[in-house]
Amino acid sequence: MARVRTLADLRTEDEADEHTPLYNAETGSRDSDSTSSGGAAPRSMPIRFLELLFPHFSLKSVVLAISIVDWIFYIVTVCLDTELPLIPAANILVHFGANYPPLIKQGQVWRLLLPVFLHANFFHVFFNVFFQLRMGFTIERRYGLLKFTGLYFASAIYGNLLSATAFFCNSLKVGASTAGFGLIGIQICEMALTWHRMRHRDRMLTNMVSFVLLMVLLMFTLNGGSIDQMGHLGGLLCGFSIGMLYNKELNDKPVWYPWASAAAIGILLALPAACFPILYAVDRHCHRDLSYI
């Protein structure tokens, strides 16, 4: 399989010694531990392959645990009931917590989070898990477990909230791509913050655009063309905004950072402040599909 390159790969090439402010001291110490000339045992071939496919692969990673839970939820929902082979029935997805706005309006706010563990078919879960692992290990390593967990689930909540507000009637959404777009958002933020000192800007931009286009193409082909655009937008905005706040200690920040940081806080506050009143107070005049219940 051809290796899909991410922002982290190119930044590592640009700054091979990893003396970039985006790598914190804890990350640096792990790097030196893993590459020291001491008595560290050589890695096995399977681990090396996984690290090639998923940079900074680690068994002790929250993104790996989340991905395992994704597969468990998918297997359970398929075993309970299917509409077609390997496609969970819609009523099963609703009972497990799918993003179904009429029920969110009734107070079932957990439906803003649980859809991140549910998927519509085999290719849907495979694709989302692959790309969140492809990006997630590096991001988790850079920011740490707690910050990564906050980024991941906040992006999922913001994405599902914007989706539920925009597509209220006859809308049933599931998938980890809301959180996945949050990971893309923080990588775009990193690229923007370090753009002025990158040596290979054209290559960085080309690979990022190619990566996003490939992801969108696969979504349309493997998920039947049913794309939650607003969910992706919400996750992307959340990830980008959180990235601005996570990198406030970055050295040599662009001159526009104070305004961008203020805008990021504004987005994180304004989106729920606008969406919740619309979601709960505005009568959409649509009927709940009782076949889902």
From Swiss-Prot:
The UniProt record lists the keyword Transmembrane helix: yes
Segments of this protein annotated with the region Disordered: 18-40
Membrane-spanning segments: 62-82, 112-132, 148-168, 174-194, 217-237, 262-282
Principal location listed in the UniProt entry: membrane
Highest taxon of the lineage: Eukaryota
Keyword Transmembrane helix found: yes
EC number: 3.4.21.105
Keyword line: Cytoplasmic vesicle, Hydrolase, Membrane, Protease, Serine protease, Transmembrane, Transmembrane helix
GO biological process, one term: proteolysis
Location in the cell: Cytoplasmic vesicle, Secretory vesicle, Microneme membrane
Entry's Gene Ontology cellular component terms: cytoplasmic vesicle; microneme membrane
Membrane topology annotation: Multi-pass membrane protein
Residues at the catalytic site: 177 (nucleophile), 232
GO molecular function: serine-type endopeptidase activity
Catalytic activity: Cleaves type-1 transmembrane domains using a catalytic dyad composed of serine and histidine that are contributed by different transmembrane domains
Family: Belongs to the peptidase S54 family.
Function: Serine protease involved in intramembrane proteolysis and the subsequent release of polypeptides from their membrane anchors. Has no detectable activity towards MIC2.
Protein name as catalogued: Rhomboid-like protease 1
Organism in which the protein naturally occurs: Toxoplasma gondii
Gene that encodes the chain: ROM1
